[in-house]
């Protein structure tokens, strides 16, 4: 568990990564180990998500606006409280919107509207006393691992069986993540391989993962 010094140092950590990579599992573990609050992406109460998978051209823009609003609220609360872990954040939102534009699910006009709204939100975030996370953790895994995780968690609308268009969406999204991570510059960042450090099937990896995260936080505080 966290020592007294750790408790005195508030921290905000955001996770990022492909659908199905394991963000919620890592978020729960990190929050538990650090004694912080976990913020999870809403799935079960999302009124649009399953509709998007059924008809992405009809619902992609609405879904991204829905997520943007929710994540804007979450990031403001998290930056205000400054002692928490988020399993996804506003910093990734534009990636999903851009991929949907590339696939023709979101028009260029709607993409411009979205980007303008996002820019306004980021400007407001920049005016807050705490402007960015202390650390972003990008979870990486092979595409086969991603598909295995999606299949295992069993959400019917996420399954690629007999749905080549959904598989293409996953493949395109997956292909864009490495550059997104390279371009991310709002805060210190690290990459953790879920293939190497699987904490679900191998809980003994938790301590090594926390060592990596703790070292990254300490290094970030020096700079």
What are these model-derived regions, one by one?
Residues 96-175:
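A glycine- and Lys/Arg-enriched "phosphate-lid" helix/loop adjacent to the NTP-binding pocket
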Residues 32-71, 95-99:
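Conserved substrate/cofactor phosphate-moiety recognition/catalytic segment
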Residues 151-223:
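NTP-dependent small-molecule kinase module
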Residues 23:
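Conserved lysine of the Walker
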Residues 26, 30:
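Hydrophobic positions on the alpha1 helix immediately C-terminal to the Walker A/P-loop
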Residues 2-10:
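Phosphate-binding P-loop
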Residues 18:
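P-loop (Walker A) phosphate-binding loop of NTP-binding proteins
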Residues 15:
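Hydrophobic anchor at the beta1->P-loop junction of P-loop NTPases
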């Amino acid at each position: 568990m966290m020592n007294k010094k750790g408790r005195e140092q508030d921290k905000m950590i955001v996770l990022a990564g492909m659908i199905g990579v394991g963000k919620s599992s890592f978020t729960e573990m990190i929050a538990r180990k650090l004694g912080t609050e976990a913020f999870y992406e809403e799935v079960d109460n999302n009124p649009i998500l399953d509709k998007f998978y059924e008809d992405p051209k009809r619902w992609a823009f609405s879904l991204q606006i829905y997520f943007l609003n929710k994540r804007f609220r979450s990031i403001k609360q998290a930056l205000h409280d400054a002692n928490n872990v988020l399993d996804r954040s506003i910093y990734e939102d534009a990636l999903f919107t851009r991929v949907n534009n590339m696939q023709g699910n979101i028009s260029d006009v709607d993409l411009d509207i979205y980007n303008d709204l996002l820019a306004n939100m980021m400007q407001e975030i920049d005016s807050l006393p705490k402007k960015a996370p202390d650390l972003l953790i990008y979870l990486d895994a092979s595409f086969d691992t991603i598909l295995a995780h999606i299949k295992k968690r069993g959400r019917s609308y996420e399954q690629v069986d007999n749905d080549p268009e959904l598989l293409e969406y996953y493949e395109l999204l997956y292909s864009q993540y490495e550059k997104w991570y390279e371009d991310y510059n709002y805060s210190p960042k690290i990459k953790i391989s879920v293939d190497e450090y699987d904490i679900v099937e191998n809980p003994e990896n938790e301590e090594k993962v926390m060592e990596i995260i703790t070292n990254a936080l300490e290094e970030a505080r020096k700079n």
